[in-house]
């Protein structure tokens, strides 16, 4: 492929600009032809067409620029009619800024500069024509550097491919170019003699501008057409209903029923549903609108299909209102209505049933579900206190306690690792597959499950070493008090009354603060989502049963009667409701929710891995292998429960 030389680009571009006229539209080159190499030999044919349609002398710089500005400033529209042309920029000013002369023939450098100024004019036509921006009081270098720095986050010395796409998006709208397959940006750059991967610089940008203007006036589509024309939506609606240009009353009734019930979707073909494109129109310094657009994934060589594309609000505004930045008026909304109806009919933005976006719980749901959860938590803690009454043997009590300790370690650490930490880090966010399907990435759950497997593996090694090598070894200093405190008789000596009362007060105060924190955590969890509330409640409940069993044993050993101990334990459990409603009130902000859940994850890991797991390792019993089996059963049950909740929590319906 041979590339244009600098002189041929400028002159051919200019005469192609001037040669386009309404009467010669049938002579537009096809998209394929426009992508082929151009040669200066075409100049004769261009001059012949030009002289037949424009009687004005073209050897005068001012007349050439005026003709060029009229054809660029007043492009043909889709209806094929040229309206009144009110130029917002004087040809003389354009020529002076480009460094041209009124009498001499235009030089190739002036032609390229004029093309660059026209690109700036196209991008900022609304501001220029509303007198918000005056092009006459700036020098040429200002417009050159303005285009080079179109995107503030990219290199200001080069026009990147993204910036080139932004410019081409404007030109496609402005000139309403061909809807056929477009010339790729890279091909356009090569045709303009731009070989650097960085893009055009200040020396080659004017040459690229001349090529863009020339091809656009010929009707050649440049870049990638990422949005359909406005007429597409109306055509889709009529085609979906009866494939004609008119609607009968019965078909209009069918349309209304579809929109009312949302029970069926009118699809023209079976295509993968696309995720809603979050493409907003971002304004950078200098009032440049950078178009971020998306396209239905079709074959590169095939025609573009928009039938199942989900357009964002910004894209619909871009299609119907030409990137309008002001508020949408009633007339604007009338124009956009076909697009909105088409999106509803095609169900393009509808997710699969099992992947619907989670809606934040309502105030009634948060307070209702969380109150039920704390009530169950309170009853569960009381269950822990009643278990001890049915076991007069200390050995049986210790075995039951270790079963629940293992369950608590599994649920607490499992909730922290499999649910809370991923939620804090945003790993629960939905992603989109290659074909546009929604799914929640579960890869992190398997990695975290491997982490839990490592914890369990080393626990087994240490426990087996303790059982096989030193079965009669003394207990370690980490042994928990709850596991070793014998169940005393109810008749405790009165001489220890003062010490017993102090110990009971310490236990009750600590238990009240602990339950308050549990209520706070449950409130934050249910404020986040119902699923988070369920998993957190299960973890806390499994922890509360052995915890309350231990506290109750300490209260009995301190000399309190059984009935008083149960009553005091119940009163301390009620502080969870205080923490709950405080948590619900302060965790309305998602940021506060995340911080509460962050501290909760740390607390769960500390309780399970620092406080309770060492107890399971060093506790002594007369039946060590039975305790070993019960501990592992509790651990496995806790981790398995939280793992299944992490996998299937999206399917939980409350």
Curated annotation (Swiss-Prot):
GO cellular component, one term: plasma membrane
Catalyzed reactions per annotation: Zn(2+)(in) = Zn(2+)(out)
Parts of the chain that traverse the membrane: 203-223, 370-390, 399-419, 449-469, 502-522, 564-584, 595-615, 627-647
Compartments reported by the entry: Membrane
A molecular function (GO) term: zinc ion transmembrane transporter activity
Tagged with keyword Membrane: yes
Glycosylation sites: 59, 162
Pfam family, one: EF-hand_Zip
GO process annotations (BP): intracellular monoatomic cation homeostasis; neural tube formation; neuron projection extension; zinc ion import across plasma membrane
Entries under InterPro entries matching the protein: ZIP, ZIP4_12_EF-hand, ZIP4_N, ZIP_Transporter
Family classification: Belongs to the ZIP transporter (TC 2.A.5) family.
UniProt name for this protein: Zinc transporter ZIP12
Species this protein is from: Bos taurus
UniProt lineage: Eukaryota, Metazoa, Chordata, Craniata, Vertebrata
């Amino acid at each position: 492929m041979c590339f244009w030389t600098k002189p041929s680009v400028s002159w051919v571009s200019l005469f192609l600009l001037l040669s386009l006229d309404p009467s010669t539209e049938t002579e537009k080159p096809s998209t394929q032809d426009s992508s082929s190499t151009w040669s200066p030999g075409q100049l004769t044919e261009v001059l012949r067409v030009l002289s037949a349609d424009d009687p004005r002398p073209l050897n005068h710089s001012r007349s050439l620029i005026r003709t060029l500005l009229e054809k660029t400033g007043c492009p043909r529209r889709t209806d094929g009619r040229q309206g009144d042309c009110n130029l917002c920029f004087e040809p003389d000013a354009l020529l002076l800024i480009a460094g041209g002369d009124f009498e001499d023939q235009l030089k190739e450098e002036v032609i390229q500069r004029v093309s660059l100024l026209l690109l700036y004019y196209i991008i900022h036509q609304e501001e220029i024509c509303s007198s918000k921006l005056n092009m006459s009081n700036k020098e040429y270098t200002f417009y050159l550097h303005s285009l080079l720095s179109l995107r503030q986050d990219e290199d200001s010395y080069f026009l990147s491919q993204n910036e080139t796409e932004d410019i081409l998006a404007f030109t496609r709208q402005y000139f309403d170019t061909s809807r056929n397959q477009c010339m790729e940006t890279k091909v356009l750059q090569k045709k303009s003699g731009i070989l650097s991967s960085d893009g055009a610089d200040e020396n080659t940008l004017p040459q690229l501008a001349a090529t863009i203007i020339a091809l656009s006036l010929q009707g050649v589509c440049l870049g990638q057409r990422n949005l359909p024309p406005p007429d597409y939506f109306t055509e889709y609606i009529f085609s979906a209903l009866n494939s004609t240009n008119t609607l009968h009353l019965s078909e209009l009734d069918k349309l209304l029923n579809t929109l009312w019930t949302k029970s069926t979707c009118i699809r023209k073909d079976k295509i993968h549903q696309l995720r809603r494109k979050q493409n907003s129109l971002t304004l950078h310094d200098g009032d440049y609108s950078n178009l971020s657009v998306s396209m239905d994934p079709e074959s590169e060589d095939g025609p573009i299909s928009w039938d199942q594309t989900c357009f964002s609000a910004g894209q619909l505004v871009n299609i119907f209102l030409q990137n309008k930045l002001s508020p949408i008026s009633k007339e604007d909304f009338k124009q956009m209505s076909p697009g909105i109806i088409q999106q509803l009919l095609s169900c393009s933005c509808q997710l699969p049933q099992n992947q619907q976006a989670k809606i934040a719980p309502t105030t009634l749901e948060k307070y209702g579900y969380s109150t039920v959860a704390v009530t169950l938590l309170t009853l569960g803690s009381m269950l822990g206190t009643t278990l001890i009454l049915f076991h007069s043997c200390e050995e049986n009590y210790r075995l039951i306690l270790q079963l629940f300790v293992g369950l608590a370690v599994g649920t607490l650490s499992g909730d922290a690792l499999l649910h809370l930490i991923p939620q804090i880090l945003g790993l629960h966010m939905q992603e989109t597959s290659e074909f546009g399907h929604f799914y929640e990435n579960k890869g992190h759950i398997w990695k975290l499950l491997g982490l839990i497997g490592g914890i369990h593996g080393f626990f087994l090694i240490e426990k087996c070493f303790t059982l096989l090598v030193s079965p009669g070894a003394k207990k370690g200093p980490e042994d928990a008090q709850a596991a070793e405190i014998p169940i005393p008789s109810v008749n405790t000596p009165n001489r220890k009354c003062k010490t017993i009362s102090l110990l009971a007060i310490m236990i009750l105060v600590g238990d009240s603060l602990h339950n308050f924190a549990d209520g706070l955590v449950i409130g934050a969890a249910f404020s986040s989502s119902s699923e988070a509330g369920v998993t957190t409640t299960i973890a806390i409940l499994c922890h509360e049963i052995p915890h309350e069993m231990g506290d109750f044993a300490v209260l009995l050993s301190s000399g309190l009667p059984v009935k008083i101990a149960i009553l005091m334990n119940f009163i301390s459990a009620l502080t969870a409701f205080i923490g709950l409603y405080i948590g619900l009130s302060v965790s309305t902000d998602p940021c506060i929710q995340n911080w509460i859940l962050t501290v909760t994850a740390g607390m769960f890991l500390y309780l399970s891995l620092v406080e309770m797991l060492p107890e399971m390792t060093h506790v002594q019993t007369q039946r060590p292998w039975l305790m070993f089996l019960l501990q592992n059963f509790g651990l496995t049950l806790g981790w398995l429960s939280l793992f299944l909740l992490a996998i299937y929590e999206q399917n939980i319906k409350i």
